[in-house]
Amino acid sequence: MTSQRTRERLIQRLYEEGLSNARVLEVIRRTPRHLFVDEALAHRAYEDTALPIGHNQTISQPYMVGRMTELLLAAGPLDKVLEIGTGSGYQTAVLAQLVERVFSVERIQVLQDRAKERLAELSLRNVVFRWGDGWEGWNALGPYNGIIVTAAAAQVPQALLDQLAPGGRLVIPVGAGDVQQLLLIVREEHGFSRHVLDAVRFVPLLNGPLA
């Protein structure tokens, strides 16, 4: 169920689907995804598919975790990354093994509490958590070299653009329903460059009262 061979099959599939960053693939290989899903779904943890984690949220497909992480790191190592949507904590755990510090915002407190426990179990101690509205980012600790958003926004939140450091990279799904696109936004000297990448499907990025 969680054997090394099962994990190796997943890594081979991700490689065949186009992931190429050896460090990202190695981190996905060694990160125990079965710890981030309900015990009843642990037998599916190393399938390349999103899985429900409760509260109308999902743990992202491993390919998408790898894809977004590769995009974030494409220009080189990052020391300060903001994650919008802690969720299960799986993407957080992958990032924590690849960058110096992760600042993770989640609006559903029970999900974030579980994620904290999982990361502590894995001795990943370079993550700072905040229970809050992801649309607002985390201005007090910005700016950030990288920002990754794990839910689809109707449009790019201005607060996230404001909190992106010069040269910083924002990876975010944008759109509603079945019409969503993954964007890479880079803060340049005189503005932002936007690159439209893949068609994707994420749960919506909510705002308003916290849960």
From Swiss-Prot:
Q: What is its main location?
A: cytoplasm
Report the EC number(s), separated by commas if there are several.
2.1.1.77
Task: Report the SUPFAM superfamilies cross-referenced here.
Answer: S-adenosyl-L-methionine-dependent methyltransferases
Q: In which compartments does the protein localize?
A: Cytoplasm
Gene3D superfamilies referenced in this protein's UniProt entry, alphabetically: Vaccinia Virus protein VP39
Short name of one Pfam family for this protein? PCMT
Known catalytic reactions: [protein]-L-isoaspartate + S-adenosyl-L-methionine = [protein]-L-isoaspartate alpha-methyl ester + S-adenosyl-L-homocysteine
Q: Name one GO molecular function term.
A: protein-L-isoaspartate (D-aspartate) O-methyltransferase activity
Q: Which residue pairs form cystines in this protein? A: none
List keywords of the entry alphabetically: Cytoplasm, Methyltransferase, S-adenosyl-L-methionine, Transferase
Q: Which residues form the active site?
A: S60
> What's in the GO CC field?
cytoplasm
Q: What class of enzyme is it?
A: transferase
Q: Which InterPro entries match?
A: PCMT, SAM-dependent_MTases_sf
Question: What is the top-level taxon of the source organism?
Answer: Bacteria
Question: Which NCBIfam families does this one have?
Answer: pimt, PRK00312.1
> What functional role does this protein have?
Catalyzes the methyl esterification of L-isoaspartyl residues in peptides and proteins that result from spontaneous decomposition of normal L-aspartyl and L-asparaginyl residues. It plays a role in the repair and/or degradation of damaged proteins.
Family assignment from sequence similarity = Belongs to the methyltransferase superfamily. L-isoaspartyl/D-aspartyl protein methyltransferase family.
Name used for this protein in its record:
Protein-L-isoaspartate O-methyltransferase
